[in-house]
Amino acid sequence: MKLPIYLDYAATCPVDERVAKKMMAFLTIDGTFGNPASRSHKFGWQAEEAVDIARNQIADLIGADSREIVFTSGATESDNLAIKGAAHFYQTKGKHILTCKTEHKAVLDTCRQLEREGFEVTYLSPEADGLIDLEKFKAALRPDTILASIMHANNEIGVLQDIKAIGELCRANKTIFHVDATQSVGKVEINLEELAVDLMSMSSHKLYGPKGVGALYVRRKPRVRLEAIIHGGGHERGMRSGTLPVHQIVGMGEAYRIAKEEMASEMPRLKALRDRLYNGLKDIEETYVNGSMEHRLDSNLNISFNYVEGESLMMALRDIAVSSGSACTSASLEPSYVLRALGLNDELAHSSIRFTLGRYTTEEEIDYTINLMKGAVEKLRALSPLWDMFKEGIDLNTIEWSAH
C-alpha cells in the first residue's frame, strides 16, 4: 500500500491509463493532430471522425443522441451555458428560475448573476436528509417559471435527487429542466430517453478523463434552444464556439466508454468499500452521517465528528487525502453551506469530513483509514475542553459564552 491514500475522488480523479494512452495519439505530427473544423483535407477529417466517435461514446452512456452533445471546457461552463443560455432565450415567456440551496457554486453563482440582470430566483431548502420535498418543489413552480436547475448527485453529501419525478413536474409546467450530473454520470444509471430532462451538465475529470473538457446535453425532442455565451466560429452548432480540443474530447469519450462497460461491477465494489468504512467509523461516539444513506452515491460518505474541528482533523490525517466541504470552496474556513442548508449547527458543519472512493481504492486503504481516523478523533477530543464538558453531562447549548 502506498501513502498518501487518495479518498477525494469527488474533487477529481486520476486519468485512467487507458485514457491517457489513447489521448497521446492525438497530439504530435505522427498522430491525429488536425483541426476537426478543417473540412478540406484528411487531417481535419480524421480529427472530426475522432470527435464523432467520442460524441457517440458519451451519448451511449446517458441514453442520448450524439447530436444532443455539446462540448465545453467543463461542467462549470456547461452549467453557465445551460442556465444563462436558456434564461436569455426564453426570457420573453417569464423571468422566474427555480433551484436549490445545496446546488454547486457553478449553478448558484450563475443564478445570482441572473438576479442582477433582473431574473427572479427561488432557492428551495432541502429536507434534513438533503432531499428535495416534491410537494414543495411543485408548489414553488409558477406559470412564469422558465427554468429549474436541480443537481442529480450532491458533490458534498452524495445525495441523489429524484430527477425523474422532478422532470415530470417541470414538463407538466412547461418549465425547462436542467440537471447538473457532474457527480452522478457513470456512477448511476442515467437514461435520458426515459427522463424529462432538457439540459444536463457533465464533466470529464470526475470520471477518470482529463481536466478542462466537459459536455452539455441539449434535448432535440422536444427541442430546447439556448443563447450562446461564447461567440466565434459557430462551432458546436453555434452553441459553443472555439476549436475543439481533440485529445481532451477523445479522452473524455474513452473515459465514458470504460465507465459504461465497468459500471455494473464497479459500483457494487465501491458500495461494499464505502459500507466497510462506515461500519468502521459509526461506533465512534458522537458521529453523524450527513445526508440520506438510502438515496446516495455508492462512493460517498460524509460524516461529522462532534467536538472535533474538521480542519484540525484533516491536519491529523496527513496520510489521507479527504476534504471538508467542496474542493472549490474548501480553501475558505466558512462552514459548508450545503451542511448548513440541512440544518446542521456551525460546530457539526465544521467537524465534517467527506470521504469519496474510486476506481483505485482498495480494502487495505479503507482499513488503514478507519484505524487512523479512530486514533485521530480520540487524540483531538482528549485535547478538547468541550469534549470534557460534554462527557461530564453539561449541555453546551445552555452555556452563555462571554467575550473578554
Swiss-Prot record:
Q: Which gene is this protein's source?
A: iscS
Assembly and partners are described as:
Homodimer. Forms a heterotetramer with IscU, interacts with other sulfur acceptors.
Q: List the disulfide bonds.
A: none
List the Gene3D superfamilies hit by this protein, alphabetically: Aspartate Aminotransferase, domain 1, Type I PLP-dependent aspartate aminotransferase-like (Major domain)
The UniProt entry, under SUPFAM superfamilies, shows: PLP-dependent transferases
Q: What does the entry list as the binding residues for [2Fe-2S] cluster?
A: C328
Q: Which domain of life is it from?
A: Bacteria
Q: Which Pfam families match?
A: Aminotran_5
Sites of the modification N6-(pyridoxal phosphate)lysine? K206
The protein in question is named Cysteine desulfurase IscS
Q: What GO terms in the biological process aspect are recorded for it?
A: [2Fe-2S] cluster assembly
Role: Master enzyme that delivers sulfur to a number of partners involved in Fe-S cluster assembly, tRNA modification or cofactor biosynthesis. Catalyzes the removal of elemental sulfur atoms from cysteine to produce alanine. Functions as a sulfur delivery protein for Fe-S cluster synthesis onto IscU, an Fe-S scaffold assembly protein, as well as other S acceptor proteins.
Active-site positions on this chain: C328 (cysteine persulfide intermediate)
- What UniProt keywords are attached to this protein's entry? 2Fe-2S, Cytoplasm, Iron, Iron-sulfur, Metal-binding, Pyridoxal phosphate, Transferase
Entry GO terms, CC: L-cysteine desulfurase complex
Identify the metabolic or biological route this protein is part of: Cofactor biosynthesis; iron-sulfur cluster biosynthesis
Q: Which cofactor does it need?
A: pyridoxal 5'-phosphate
Q: Which family does it belong to?
A: Belongs to the class-V pyridoxal-phosphate-dependent aminotransferase family. NifS/IscS subfamily.
